[in-house]
C-alpha cells in the first residue's frame, strides 16, 4: 500500500498544472444546497413572517446555489396558517387536529430526484415541517421532548444518510459552521468528479489532492480509500465509484480534532521543509504548536504553509485541498479554540488523541513524506 500511495503521488506530480492545481480552487465549485425557504427571507412561516439568517442569505448565498424548500407551503397550506406540531407517534398535525403527515411524506417522495444531488442542507431549527433534531414533540396537548425529527427531513436524510445537514442555529458555533461548510465543498467536488464520465486518472488526482484533508478527518478511512484507488483498475467503475463515495463521505463527516489538524500540518511541513532555512522551519513549527495550545486560529499555520508551498513551487502541497477546503471569502478558520475547550464542542482533542509535539524540524519530518 505504501508503494501504491507513492505511485498516486507521482501520478499527480506528473500531471499538467491545470489538472493538478487549478481544480483544487474552491471557487470553481458552486455547491447546490437545500434550505428552508424562511431562512432566505421568504415570508412562508405560519405567522406570515420569515426567519432570515444572515450567514445563509448574505454570506453563503454568494457561493452556493440554493434549492429552497417549505413543505407546509408546498402541500398547499398558506401563510399565515394554523401552526403544526409533531406528535409522539410521528404525525404532523395542525392546531385543529388535521393530519398532514401523508401529504408531507408524498412531497418528500416527489422531490427526491431534485434533492438527490445536493451537497448539503440547512434547515430551520424547531420547525415541525423542516427541522432536523430539535423539533418539539407533543402528546396530550403537552410538549414531552425537544428532540424530534420532522417528517420531511427524516425522509430526505434517510435517502442520503451522509448528506451534510445542519440547523441554522447550530451554525452560530464557528466550529460547527466550519465543519459543515468543509463537508459541503468536499461533497461538491466529489459530485463534480463522478457527475459525468471519469477516468482512473481523474480519481487518482482527486484522491491525491484530498490526501491531507482525509488524513485530518479520518486516518483509517483515508488509508482504506487510498488502497481502493490503488486497486481501482481491477474493479468495475460503478463499484469503485460507490465504494469510494461511501469511504470519502464517511471520512469527511468525522469532526477533525486539534491533534489530527496538527498531524496533517506536520505532514504538510515535511513536504516543504527541505526548501526552507532553519528560521522559517522554526517559524512554521512554532505556529503549529501555538495552534495546538489553542493560542492562534487554524488559519495562522495553514496560511504560513500555503505561503511557503507557493513560494517553493511545491506543486503537490499547493494542490492539497486541506490548505483551501472552501472559499477564503467565507472567513472561516479564524477562531482561536482556547486552551480549555472541550473535545465535543470546539475541537479540543482528548489527551489520548494527542501526539507529542515535535521538538525539532527533523522530528516533524519523520514519516511525513509517505
Annotate the PLM regions.
Residues 36-37, 70, 122-126:
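Short beta-strand segments
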Residues 40-48:
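Short N-terminal binding/cap micro-motifs at the start of the first secondary-structure element
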Residues 1-19, 339-359:
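Compositionally biased, intrinsically disordered low-complexity segments enriched
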Residues 49-66:
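Short catalytic helix/loop segments, enriched in acidic residues and glycine
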Residues 57, 68-90:
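Short, surface-exposed acidic-centric catalytic microdomains
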Residues 97-115:
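Glycine-rich anion/phosphate-binding loops
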Residues 165-341, 345, 353-354, 359, ...:
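Acidic, Ser/Pro/Thr-rich low-complexity regulatory regions
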Residues 113-195:
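Internal, conserved structured core segments that host functional sites
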Amino acid at each position: 500500500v505504501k508503494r501504491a500511495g507513492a505511485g498516486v503521488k507521482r501520478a499527480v506530480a506528473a500531471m499538467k498544472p491545470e489538472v493538478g492545481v487549478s481544480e483544487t480552487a474552491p471557487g470553481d465549485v458552486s455547491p447546490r444546497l437545500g434550505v428552508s425557504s424562511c431562512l432566505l427571507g421568504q415570508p412562508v412561516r405560519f405567522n406570515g413572517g420569515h426567519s432570515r439568517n444572515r450567514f445563509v442569505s448574505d454570506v453563503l448565498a454568494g457561493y452556493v446555489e440554493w434549492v429552497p424548500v417549505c413543505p407546509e407551503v408546498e402541500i398547499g397550506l398558506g401563510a399565515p396558517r394554523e401552526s403544526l406540531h409533531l406528535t409522539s407517534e410521528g404525525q404532523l398535525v395542525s392546531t385543529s387536529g388535521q393530519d398532514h403527515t401523508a401529504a408531507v411524506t408524498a412531497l418528500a417522495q416527489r422531490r427526491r430526484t431534485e434533492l438527490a444531488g445536493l451537497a448539503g442542507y440547512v434547515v430551520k431549527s424547531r420547525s415541525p415541517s423542516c427541522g432536523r433534531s430539535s423539533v418539539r414533540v407533543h402528546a396530550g396537548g403537552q410538549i414531552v421532548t425537544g428532540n424530534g425529527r420532522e417528517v420531511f427531513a427524516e425522509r430526505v436524510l434517510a435517502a442520503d444518510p451522509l448528506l451534510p445537514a445542519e440547523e441554522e442555529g447550530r451554525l452560530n458555533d464557528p466550529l460547527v459552521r466550519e465543519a459543515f461548510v468543509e463537508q459541503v465543498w468536499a461533497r461538491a467536488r466529489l459530485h463534480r468528479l463522478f457527475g459525468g464520465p471519469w477516468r482512473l486518472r481523474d480519481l487518482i488526482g482527486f484522491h491525491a489532492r484530498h490526501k491531507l484533508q482525509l488524513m485530518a478527518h479520518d486516518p483509517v478511512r483515508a488509508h482504506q480509500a487510498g488502497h481502493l484507488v490503488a486497486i481501482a483498475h481491477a474493479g468495475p467503475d460503478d463499484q469503485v465509484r460507490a465504494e469510494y463515495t461511501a469511504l470519502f463521505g464517511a471520512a469527511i463527516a468525522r469532526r477533525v480534532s486539534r491533534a489530527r489538524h496538527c498531524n496533517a500540518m506536520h505532514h504538510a511541513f515535511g513536504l516543504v521543509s527541505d526548501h526552507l532555512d532553519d528560521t522559517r522551519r522554526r517559524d512554521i513549527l512554532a505556529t503549529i504548536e501555538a495552534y495546538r495550545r489553542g493560542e492562534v486560529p487554524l488559519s495562522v499555520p495553514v496560511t504560513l504553509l500555503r505561503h511557503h508551498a507557493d513560494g517553493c513551487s511545491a506543486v503537490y502541497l499547493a494542490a492539497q485541498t486541506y490548505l483551501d477546503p472552501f472559499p477564503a471569502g467565507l472567513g472561516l478558520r479564524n477562531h482561536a479554540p482556547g486552551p480549555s475547550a472541550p473535545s465535543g464542542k470546539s475541537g479540543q482533542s482528548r489527551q489520548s488523541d494527542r501526539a507529542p509535539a515535535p521538538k525539532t524540524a527533523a522530528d516533524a519530518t519523520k514519516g511525513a513524506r509517505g
